[in-house]
Amino acid sequence: MSQTMLSCTGATRPTSALLRRENRRTQKTRRMVRAAFATQSFGPCSCHGGEHLSDERKAELVSVCEQIGAAGKGITACDEGPGTIGMRLENVGMVNTEENRRAYRQMLFEAPNANKYLSAAILDPETLYQKSDSQKHNGKLFPAVLSEIGIVPGVKPHLKVYALPGQSGATVMQGLDSLAVRLQEYKDAGCKFAKWRSPMDIDVANGQPSDLTIETNMLDLARYALICQDVGLVPIVEPDVSLKGDHDLETAVRINVKIQSVLFKAMLDHGVYMEGALLKSNMVNPGKNCSKTYTVDEIAEANLEVFRRCFPTAMRSANYLSGGQSLEDAAARLD
């Protein structure tokens, strides 16, 4: 006795007849899909990022990403330019000379057990070509010293921001034009990754960040990431929304989701190999002048919400920057 299945009309059909009909439909669908794919061009700008990279290059990028994203460790940002670090030296009575900057970096890099807590260090280009004069590492460039210690050396390759005309003071970063040449020099000096920062402010009254501001900055980050991987460096992309303003936490979540969604789509559209890239983003917070107070748990949940909505699981790790917050607040919100 043949079995029967209930059809959508309530009548019955023999199972074998249904299977034959479904098989014909499946074969027709497969032919249509093959025909559609035959007319499409899936080049390096498809969603299969990294098609232009060799398997060896991909493996190298992933390996560096895994080292940087090691559990229980963090990235130290030592990429202040001479002017910025000079103000800090002067605050403690030191003259801002290249030798004092070098000695300060050496003290940080060669501190006992630094590699237990740090996975990577972001350097200013000046620091790449400075040498240690310690007994253990005498004469070695700082990138080599860091590598020997077990800390991955990287570099800040971007230049300065300039204002986007007609965008209420919103900015975009300079440095893409000469990026490939400089990145090759930095790699030759011992760097394994680079970090590009795109700063933005939330200014609800002036409509910032506008679509133009977001798209301009995120497209630059995507192109930077593509160039990095072509040279052989892991790109860390840093969309940095500042704490300026009086916006609430809900507004911060909405805008950060939009920014990161535009960023990750741009990276895919550019053909960036997502497994060989890392995110370094601001911690999602209300504006410093917000009239409403939020708990640590509410802010932590807001950050998780942003990741749940847009973070690509192909990426090995996401890293927070703590700028604008006290160490105690940043640690509590991260924990």
Labelled PLM ranges:
Residues 1-22:
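N-terminal chloroplast transit peptides
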Residues 42-189, 202, 292, 296, ...:
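Alpha/beta catalytic barrel-like cores
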Residues 97, 196, 237, 279:
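Conserved, mostly hydrophobic/aromatic
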Residues 128-129, 160-164, 199-207, 242-246, ...:
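Conserved radical SAM core fold
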Residues 176-193, 217-233, 259-270, 300-310, ...:
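Structured alpha-helical segments in the cores of large, soluble enzyme domains
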Residues 188-210:
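A glycine-rich phosphate/pyrophosphate-binding beta-strand-loop-alpha-helix module
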Residues 212-236, 240, 244-254:
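Active-site acidic/histidine proton-transfer and metal-coordination neighborhood
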Residues 247-335:
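Active-site capping/gating regions of soluble enzymes
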